[in-house]
């Protein structure tokens, strides 16, 4: 048999296989439809006990990330092997990959940052609720390339569409329970499913979500993550509904879209509406219809939705709308550091020095005059107390207790975990006292920006943000995070996280791919006739990617949302490539 004949037979078998269910889609379906529901209790050590800002007890309970991470890594490794095998077996079916060059650079910088990581173990395996180690980050890219390469036939797009519908319906059921304040994890029978017998005997009935009320977080740990997840699905449903000709299907898709928007509302995540607005603008520009004609439908639709959602929020005591009003921290504390001479305090523009002399706490003004604390006027409650048996001072500020001690080297801060450390001036960008905005995001960004210059070439390593962020900013965290002991494990901005953990060059490479994705698909879908499922699903996935990229200004990359983004990106590119070919 000649080589040419053998190749033709391979092609024939390959085409026959594609006419039925394409089993190459199984890895994508596992990630889209199965992984979001992996919930299992795990106990692990984060390794932070060595730091003064963390407790000596560093064993953490995790329900949502630990096993999900390993599931994703196993599937990603298998997917990479299948992709390599397929490319070797059917080289003639391999699509052009020039657009993926920036991702190759991005992958290289991730590997370099891992090798130079401040915590190589965490960068390899993942850590501290995130679990996005090097294998996970590279796995994202594998799935993007895989989706791009294997999505070929009309049936492939239908299969993925059915998977999207199925996962959303299950998520919607979870969301309905949560809106009714009856999360399934509150039930003992469900807790038995997500724990071992030994764990249930110890922890059963004690699991509590960290979100009160009826916040929708689905099976994704955090309402913000649920919001990002749902904003990627909403454009898909909207495109499928608006382009559907069959009346029954159109109604069904409309119900899916409306349900998705309702669930988004109950996440109470403000960034989701920014992301949806960006996608709406882009979708309107790409539409075949003239903008003026579209506005006749869009504006009334927005008005109706606004009335409906405000009505729902009124019934819910304006839970959502109240979040748009940021509460300014009621404190005038500006600075507090420890020194050899005492605790230096700047409050309401006035400087003071607190000392411990003969087991008695004393306070002096800027000129060195002793002042009675009761005679000092403060807008917030402040008091000083000393222990008779221990050389400690308690300072009550910002509704927090700061404990200070004195030894031969001077004064030190005693953390809530009983560790001794210093309060120092923290490098920061002046935010004009607006650090509280965005649920404290401005505070985190103002402390993150000064450390960016350290990570131009390589970053600190995957999953190490918590270890390089100035966690010793106890005063700042007391004011803007309500707890000086809180660990800031992410910047709430994926672009900042990429820069810190993977380096500036990695961020540039990632953004370069985003630009190519926007340009390639934007050009292709501009005024495109939505006559087949692959074009419709491709456009929906493209707009979903835009939602993710816009939302990433206020949210981080996570195992709960990012796999969907990269698969959607591959689908959008595959759809554009399919018809173009």
Label every model-predicted segment:
Residues 2-9, 15-16, 20-41, 70-86, ...:
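Alpha-helical transmembrane segments of multi-pass inner-membrane proteins
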Residues 43-55, 184-196, 459, 469:
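Interfacial/capping segments of alpha-helical transmembrane domains
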Residues 46-65, 122-123, 201-219, 443, ...:
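Juxtamembrane membrane-water interface segments that cap and precede transmembrane helices
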Residues 87-96:
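Membrane-helix interface linkers and caps
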Residues 123-134:
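Non-cytosolic membrane-interface motifs at loop->transmembrane helix junctions
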Residues 222, 401, 407-488, 495, ...:
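TM-adjacent membrane-interface loops and short helices in multi-pass inner/ER membrane proteins
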Residues 577-581:
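Membrane-interface capping segments at transmembrane-helix boundaries
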């Amino acid at each position: 048999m000649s080589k040419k004949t053998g190749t033709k037979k391979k092609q024939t078998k390959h085409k026959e296989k594609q006419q039925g269910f394409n089993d190459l889609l199984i890895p994508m379906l596992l990630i889209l439809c199965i992984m979001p529901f992996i919930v299992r209790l795990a106990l692990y050590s984060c390794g932070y006990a060595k730091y003064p800002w963390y407790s000596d007890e560093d064993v953490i309970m995790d329900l949502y990330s630990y096993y999900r991470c390993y599931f994703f890594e196993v599937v990603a490794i298998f997917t990479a092997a299948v992709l390599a095998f397929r490319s070797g077996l059917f080289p003639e079916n391999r699509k052009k990959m020039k657009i993926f060059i920036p991702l190759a650079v991005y992958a290289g910088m991730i590997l370099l940052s891992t090798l130079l990581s401040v915590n190589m173990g965490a960068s390899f395996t993942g850590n501290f609720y995130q679990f996005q180690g090097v294998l996970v980050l590279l796995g994202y890219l594998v799935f993007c390339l895989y989706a791009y390469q294997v999505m070929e036939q009309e049936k492939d797009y239908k299969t993925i569409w059915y998977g999207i519908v199925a996962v959303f319906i299950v998520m919607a059921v979870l969301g309905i329970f949560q809106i009714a304040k009856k999360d399934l994890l509150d039930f003992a029978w469900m807790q038995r499913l997500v724990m071992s017998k030994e764990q249930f005997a110890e922890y059963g009935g004690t699991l509590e979500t960290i979100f009160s009320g009826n916040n929708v977080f689905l099976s994704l740990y955090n309402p913000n993550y649920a919001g990002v997840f749902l904003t990627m699905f909403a454009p898909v449903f909207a495109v499928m509904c608006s382009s559907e000709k069959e009346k029954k299907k159109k109604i069904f898709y409309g119900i899916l879209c409306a349900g998705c928007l309702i669930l988004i509302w109950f996440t109470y995540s403000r960034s989701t509406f920014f992301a949806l607005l960006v996608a709406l603008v882009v979708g309107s520009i790409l539409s075949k219809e003239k903008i003026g004609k579209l506005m006749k439908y869009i504006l009334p639709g927005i008005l109706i939705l606004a009335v409906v959602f405000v009505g729902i929020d009124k019934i819910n005591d304006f839970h959502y709308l109240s979040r748009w009003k940021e509460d300014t921290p009621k404190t005038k504390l500006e600075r507090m550091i420890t020194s050899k001479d005492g605790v230096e305090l700047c409050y309401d523009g006035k400087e003071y020095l607190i000392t411990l002399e003969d087991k008695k706490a004393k306070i002096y003004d800027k000129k060195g005059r002793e002042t009675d604390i009761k005679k000092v006027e403060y807008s917030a409650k402040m008091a000083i107390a000393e222990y008779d048996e221990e050389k400690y001072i308690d300072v009550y500020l910002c509704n927090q207790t700061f404990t200070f001690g004195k030894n031969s080297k001077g004064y030190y801060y005693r953390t809530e975990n009983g560790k001794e450390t210093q309060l120092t001036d923290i490098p920061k960008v002046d935010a004009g006292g607006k650090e509280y905005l965005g649920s404290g995001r401005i505070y985190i960004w103002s402390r993150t920006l000064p450390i960016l210059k350290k990570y131009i070439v390589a970053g600190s390593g995957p999953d190490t943000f918590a270890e390089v962020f100035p966690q010793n900013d106890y005063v700042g965290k007391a004011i803007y995070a309500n707890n000086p002991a809180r660990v800031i494990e992410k910047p709430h901005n994926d672009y900042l996280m990429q820069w810190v953990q993977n380096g500036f060059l990695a961020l540039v490479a990632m953004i370069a791919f985003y630009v190519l994705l926007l340009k390639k698909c934007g050009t292709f879908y501009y005024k495109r006739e939505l006559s087949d499922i692959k074009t419709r699903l491709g456009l929906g996935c493209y707009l979903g990617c835009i939602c993710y990229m816009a939302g990433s200004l206020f949210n981080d990359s996570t195992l709960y949302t990012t796999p969907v983004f990269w698969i959607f990106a591959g689908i959008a590119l595959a759809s554009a490539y399919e018809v173009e070919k």
